[in-house]
Structures are given as structure tokens and as C-alpha cells.
């Protein structure tokens, strides 16, 4: 891969003045070889990946130093724990969780993801055991993450899985609930937690990369002062191309040094609580005074289309979620607009129709009850099914009332407690079973 002198200078400016970084380099590794009906045997087999994780951590640090690029997090995704718990006892899931947490800490891995299950049409022993142990698994670890895929365009939506999930997250503190999500159509190669897991059909081990560049897009728009929407689209597209090329360079270098496959650059624009690193701020730079105002959806649609076209030109290894993230707490401007009243749950659902964020990193007051949260999650997963999109809900139940917030610090930012509608939905949420797949399923063959 060759780079022109002009391109190198531009990237240098992006790195030093516009907060461009690599959000995550994620090692995705098959761990199914360690499945056994004896916990001790499983743990002993899993020990084989320790040296691999140690090499990965060292190589990522070396690549970051070599290119002068800030790599924010090192992450690992493993095969879904559901498959281990098909043959192990329920309580063994906690021991697996604690072991994965220890091995991540030992090797300076920020997150290890894969305490996950697929239950979009019903439960197996393993998927139900993951759900039942989710509270303890997260409460007894610090780096473990995982998700429940409770809906898909192919299969429909498992309402019973949503109910159990809500019961579990109401029992865990905010920091722990930030490490789990419930999703529709989850991809097999996401570099982001908590959706990351080593999916079916993936190679034995592979590298997936997530980039972060909202500040770069914002600066490009401000510099260029576009006069037409076509010019605006083109500016974003060109900036996205350069951001993606950086992700490709880092991912391929790490993979080559490890002697494994490079699979995915996730094109998602991932914000952070830092000033100047906000997706919402891009929308406001495009001309919407406050995100949430009318026109926000159209502006986000332009942003998404341009990012995807620019990114797809820069790499043939597109994967993961590849859209914009608008996690409320992790985006400083989104958080402020939520407190000001410009962003509510239905605004987030509307914006999710053109991006892959869903309801992400938003607080709900426990005092408003579980039924409304179940209804909210079913809304966002239904949108994912109907549009055949990757969507999810990462909701943070909090004891505080709507309108308040708590600050988790770091990448997690300020959790705003949004008000749920004061409407009784208990009759609807009392139904059991699953919502059948839609007519969209017939379009897939």
C-alpha cells in the first residue's frame, strides 16, 4: 500500500489537530476447541490462547509507536459462551467469565467480549444459561462484555429473551450494564464491544479494526465551506476515505506481524466524550443548530451515505457495524442536547433508521418500571427487523429520576436519564413467545 506525500501530511494533521485515532484493534479468536463437559478441562484448554493474546498486545503497541498513531483500546472477541454452556452447568459460566477477565487483565486487554448468546427464535440450554448468569458474570468482572441477539430479519423477535434481559440489567450497576446489549442482526466480525464475538464462518483468528474520526469530518466541512449538498457530500466522502485508509494500514500491519488474517475495517464514526470528537457536532456543523431539530435525520442520512461510499473506496474489507454511532453518553454534544430536551427516545429511534446505533448508552429510571423498558427495546429491535439492519439497545437502569445524570468518566462519559412515556404497556408486554419474522423474510429467498 503506497501513500503520497500530500496524503501523509493530511493524515499527520488529522492525528495531531483533529483527534483522529484508532478506536480499537480487536483480535477475534476461535475458542470452540476448548469446549468440554468438564470445566477444568475447558479452562486448561483456554490457557492456550494466553501467549497469543500476549503477542497481540505487544504488537499493537509496537504498531502504534511505529506510525505515531494513538490506538485507544485493545480488544479481544471470543466464540460465544453459549456454546460452552450447552454442555457445562449454569454456574460454570461465572467461572468462565472470571477466567476471561483475568486473562484480559494479564495481557493489558481493555475488553474481552463474547459472553453472548443467540436467542432470536427461542432458547437452547446454552443461551438461557447465558441470560440467567449475565448479572453475576458482569458484576464479578471488569473487562468482560457480551450481547444477546434477540431478533433477526430471518427469525423474528424473542420477547421472552427481552424480558429476561431487562430483569438482569436492573440488577447490575451502571458500569456493568454498559458492557452488555441486546441486538438484532448482529454481525460476526464487529470490532466494537459489546457486540464483538468470534462469529460463525470466521477464520481461526483475525484482526478487525474500528476507526474514530468525527473531528476530521467536522474540520473538513468547516475548512471547505460547501455551497451545495453535493459539495457537502463529496467533502465528507473524501475525509472518510482518508480515515478508512489509516484503519486499513494499522489493521493489515498488525495482522501481518501476527501471521493471521485481516478481515474488517468498521467504517463507523465513533465519538468520545472529548470536545471536538462528536458525531452530533458534525450534524450541527452541517447546519442544524441543535441536533434533534427538524432536518437532523436528513443530515445524518447524508453523512452516512458519504462515509460508506468513501470508506468502501478505501478498503475492500468493510465489515462490522459500519455506520455512525450516536451513543448518548459517549458523545459530549449528544449528552448536552439530551439534558436540554432536544433528544428523546423517539428521536433516537428515528435517527437509528439511517445509522446503526439504536438506543445506545442511555439511562432509564428504575422508578418507571420494567414494562416500559421492554416496550422500548422491542421498538428498536422491530425497526432492525423491518429494515434488515444491525440495531441494538444498551440501556443503563439508574435509581435517579428522569432528567438527572451520572458521570462514569473515560470513554463512557455522562449517562443522561431520559424520561420514558407515562403510558401503561403492561398488557402488551405480558404476551409470551416471539414475534414472527416479517414479510421482509420472503425477500431473502
From Swiss-Prot:
InterPro entries: UPF0210. This is UPF0210 protein STK_02450. It comes from Sulfurisphaera tokodaii (strain DSM 16993 / JCM 10545 / NBRC 100140 / 7). It comes from the Archaea. Belongs to the UPF0210 family.
Amino acid at each position: 500500500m503506497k501513500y503520497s506525500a500530500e496524503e501523509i501530511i493530511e493524515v499527520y494533521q488529522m492525528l495531531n489537530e483533529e483527534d483522529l485515532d484508532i478506536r480499537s484493534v480487536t483480535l477475534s479468536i476461535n475458542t470452540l476447541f476448548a469446549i468440554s463437559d468438564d470445566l477444568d478441562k475447558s479452562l486448561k484448554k483456554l490457557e492456550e490462547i494466553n501467549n497469543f493474546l500476549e503477542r497481540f498486545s505487544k504488537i499493537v503497541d509496537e504498531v502504534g509507536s511505529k506510525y505515531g498513531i494513538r490506538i485507544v483500546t485493545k480488544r479481544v472477541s471470543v466464540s460465544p459462551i453459549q456454546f460452552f454452556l450447552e454442555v457445562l452447568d449454569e454456574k460454570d459460566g461465572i467461572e468462565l467469565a472470571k477466567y476471561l477477565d483475568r486473562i484480559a487483565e494479564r495481557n493489558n486487554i481493555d475488553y474481552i467480549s463474547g459472553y453472548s448468546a443467540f436467542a432470536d427464535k427461542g432458547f437452547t440450554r446454552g443461551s438461557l444459561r447465558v441470560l440467567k448468569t449475565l448479572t453475576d458474570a458482569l458484576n464479578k468482572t471488569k473487562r468482560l462484555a457480551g450481547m444477546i441477539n434477540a431478533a433477526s430479519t430471518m427469525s423474528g423477535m424473542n420477547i421472552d429473551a427481552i424480558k429476561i434481559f431487562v430483569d438482569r440489567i436492573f440488577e447490575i450497576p451502571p458500569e456493568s450494564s454498559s458492557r452488555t446489549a441486546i441486538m438484532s442482526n448482529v454481525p460476526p466480525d464487529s470490532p466494537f464491544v459489546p457486540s464483538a464475538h468470534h462469529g460463525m464462518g470466521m477464520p481461526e483468528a483475525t484482526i478487525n479494526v474500528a476507526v474514530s474520526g468525527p473531528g476530521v469530518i467536522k474540520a473538513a466541512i468547516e475548512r471547505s465551506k460547501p455551497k451545495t449538498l453535493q459539495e457537502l457530500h463529496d467533502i465528507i466522502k473524501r475525509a472518510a476515505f482518508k480515515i478508512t485508509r489509516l484503519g486499513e494500514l494499522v489493521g493489515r500491519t498488525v495482522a501481518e506481524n501476527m501471521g493471521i488474517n485481516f478481515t474488517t475495517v468498521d467504517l463507523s464514526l465513533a465519538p468520545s466524550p472529548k470536545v471536538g470528537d462528536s458525531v452530533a457536532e458534525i450534524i450541527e456543523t452541517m447546519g442544524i443548530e441543535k441536533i434533534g431539530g427538524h432536518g437532523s435525520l436528513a443530515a445524518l442520512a447524508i453523512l452516512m451515505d458519504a462515509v460508506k461510499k468513501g470508506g468502501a473506496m478505501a478498503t475492500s474489507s468493510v465489515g462490522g457495524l459500519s455506520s455512525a454511532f450516536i451513543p448518548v453518553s459517549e458523545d459530549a454534544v449528544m449528552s448536552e442536547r439530551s439534558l436540554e430536551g432536544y433528544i428523546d427516545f423517539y428521536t433516537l429511534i428515528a435517527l437509528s433508521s439511517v445509522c446503526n446505533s439504536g438506543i445506545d448508552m442511555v439511562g432509564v429510571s428504575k422508578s418507571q418500571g420494567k414494562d416500559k423498558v421492554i416496550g422500548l427495546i422491542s421498538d428498536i429491535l422491530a425497526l432492525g427487523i423491518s429494515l434488515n439492519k444491525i440495531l441494538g439497545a444498551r440501556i443503563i437502569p439508574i435509581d435517579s429520576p428522569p432528567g438527572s445524570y451520572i458521570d462514569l468518566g473515560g470513554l463512557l462519559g455522562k449517562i443522561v436519564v431520559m424520561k420514558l412515556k407515562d403510558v401503561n404497556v403492561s398488557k402488551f408486554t405480558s404476551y409470551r413467545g416471539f414475534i414472527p419474522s416479517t414479510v421482509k423474510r420472503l425477500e431473502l429467498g
